[in-house]
């Protein structure tokens, strides 16, 4: 009898055990390639400015993924694609105390419709103004991350539209993703230095010469520092300043064209943080030294900001220039050059008083205006509130050869043809001022920068491509940064007395505080929900229980099987 029992058991195991094993492996062992995915994530801004806190105050993430379609988001990592992102969905995640928010960006922003780009640019300041302890990250889309998002979205959507039994079954059998960051909690960066660069071209004809100051801030800004490339704001201004340094260094190298003006060039750091570099530079030159070009005879200060696009040009002033002043001369020469050489360009002066009650200044020239130095900002933007000045969407450089081909350009970008035109307008205007050409009877259609002295569009293109090849957020550029070193080298090629100016926040009452952990590695692990372990344990226990009862009552089972399988005797 036991030999027959052994034979029956052996036949049962041959059939059932391999099938059970395969079923078990299918349920708990997904493909190895999909078990985990590692990708880079970029954290939202976190900084303090003049006592106000901005951005996300947390960096640690270890929680399960959901999409915003899920009804319950508490302690979950909420994933959203940029195309589906809205401020209402973001607020929903914060209200439900989400564990984190991950916003997935496309690799090619030009694939996004213009309305989505514009909407997100307008939302970036609101995201930063809403201080939160929820970690907020941005990730660039790839095939694996998109697959994770799609699976998570299907799982999240099914929970809200199914019955309770279906939700329970789906919860027990579905795969989830545990999102984990590898970095530590963010902390304040101590003794961070913001670097600014200064260089000059000394005029000819005496010691007490008037000085023209040309200024551009080189840092970029956006909702995530590691995604802030600042092509137009303010890579365009930096490129123009460097090209002006090259052009006027050539003019100042010949005795006949060596003008009676000092030209002072200043690349300021911390421009996106209320112009901290400019503020300290003015303090050092006006309060702490007697030998400064800023103390004697400043004709005017011209700040260059966001000049890489558009057929509009605006001269922003805090106080309209008086007739007969150098500032008025600059205004009139600008109008002359635009009218005679570039009639397609629309030029206008924009007057806005300095509002000291605001948390931040509107334009860089206001820093000089506070110290009673005559200053302007030249920009193609009509308002300082334009979202294009502070957006991660400002990352594209477009050459004229690509215009009109393929998809239309979306978002802020640099049009090299218009950047070159604006550079020439500024150069021609400055030349007419320092050589006093209008009073000498020179007509406005005379072009000075032609042939060997013309603006080099190829050099402008190289500068913009280099500036936009890496993020230039102030938190990422220490005093030994390759960007700072290269800018210093470029200035040294054309200017004299190139020097650095460092700004460090006061330790007792800092005006600005930066934080670390702005870029991390995130891992998405494929996991089963906790209830799956309970369900699996119940199934295994039931299987073993049935097997135990079958062995204990094998005599009854054997007799039953004999009766079922015994051949029937035919009755005649």
UniProtKB/Swiss-Prot annotation:
InterPro entries recorded? Nicalin (IPR016574), Peptidase_M28 (IPR007484)
| Membrane side Cytoplasmic: residue ranges | 552-572
UniProt keywords (A-Z) are: Developmental protein, Endoplasmic reticulum, Glycoprotein, Membrane, Signal, Transmembrane, Transmembrane helix
Signal peptide feature range:
1-35
Question: Pfam families given for it?
Answer: Peptidase_M28
Glycosylation, residue list: 108, 234, 436
From the Swiss-Prot or TrEMBL record, give the protein name: BOS complex subunit ncln
Q: Which organism is it from?
A: Danio rerio
The gene name reads ncln
């Amino acid at each position: 009898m036991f030999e027959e029992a052994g034979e029956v058991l052996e036949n049962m195991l041959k059939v059932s055990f391999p099938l059970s094993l395969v079923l078990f492996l299918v349920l708990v062992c997904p493909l190895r390639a999909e078990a985990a995915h590692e990708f880079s994530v970029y954290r939202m801004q976190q900084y303090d400015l003049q006592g106000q806190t901005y951005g996300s105050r947390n960096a640690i993430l270890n929680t399960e993924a959901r999409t915003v379609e899920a009804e319950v988001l508490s302690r979950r990592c909420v994933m959203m694609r940029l195309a589906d992102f809205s401020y209402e969905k973001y607020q929903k995640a914060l209200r439900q105390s989400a564990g984190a928010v991950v916003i997935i960006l496309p690799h090619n922003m030009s694939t996004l419709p213009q309305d989505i780009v514009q909407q997100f640019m307008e939302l970036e300041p609101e995201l930063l103004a809403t201080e939160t302890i929820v970690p907020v990250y941005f990730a660039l889309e790839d095939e694996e991350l998109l697959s994770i998002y799609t699976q998570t979205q299907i799982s999240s959507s099914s929970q809200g539209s199914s019955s309770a039994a279906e939700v329970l079954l789906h919860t027990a059998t579905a795969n989830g993703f545990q999102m984990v960051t590898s970095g530590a909690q963010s902390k304040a960066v101590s003794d961070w230095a913001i670097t600014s660069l200064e260089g000059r071209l000394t005029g000819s004809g005496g010691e007490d010469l008037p000085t023209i100051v040309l200024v551009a801030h080189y840092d970029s800004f956006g909702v995530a520092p590691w995604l802030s490339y600042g092509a137009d704001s303010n890579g365009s201004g930096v490129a123009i300043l460097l090209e002006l340094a090259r052009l006027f260094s050539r003019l100042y190298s010949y005795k006949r064209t060596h003008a009676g003006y000092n030209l002072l060039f200043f690349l300021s750091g911390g421009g996106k943080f209320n112009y901290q570099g400019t503020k300290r530079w003015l303090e050092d030159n006006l309060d702490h030294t007697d030998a400064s070009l800023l103390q004697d005879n400043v004709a005017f200060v011209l700040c260059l900001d966001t000049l890489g696009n558009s057929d509009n040009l605006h001269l922003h002033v805090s106080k309209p220039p008086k007739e007969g002043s150098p500032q008025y001369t600059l205004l009139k020469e600008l109008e002359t050059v635009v009218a005679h050489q570039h009639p397609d360009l629309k030029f206008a002066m924009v007057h806005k008083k300095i509002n000291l009650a605001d948390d931040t200044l509107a334009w860089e020239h206001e820093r000089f205006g506070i110290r009673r130095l005559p200053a302007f900002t030249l920009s193609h933007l009509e308002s300082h509130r334009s979202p294009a000045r502070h957006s991660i969407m400002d990352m594209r450089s477009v050459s004229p050869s690509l215009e009109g081909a393929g998809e239309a350009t979306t978002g802020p970008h640099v049009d090299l043809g218009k950047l070159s035109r604006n550079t020439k307008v500024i150069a021609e205007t400055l030349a007419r001022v320092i050589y006093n050409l209008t009073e000498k009877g020179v007509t406005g259609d005379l072009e000075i920068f032609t042939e060997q002295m013309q603006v080099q569009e190829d050099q402008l293109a190289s500068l913009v491509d280099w500036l936009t090849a890496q993020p230039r957020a102030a938190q990422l550029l220490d005093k030994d940064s390759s960007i700072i070193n290269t800018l210093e080298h470029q200035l040294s090629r054309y200017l004299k007395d190139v020097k650095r100016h460092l700004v460090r926040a006061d330790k007792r009452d800092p005006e600005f505080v930066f934080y670390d952990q702005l870029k991390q590695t995130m891992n998405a692990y494929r996991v089963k929900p906790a209830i799956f372990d309970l369900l699996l344990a119940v199934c295994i226990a039931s299987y073993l229980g049935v097997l135990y009862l079958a062995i204990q009552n094998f005599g009854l089972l054997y007799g039953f099987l004999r009766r079922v399988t015994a051949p029937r005797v035919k009755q005649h």
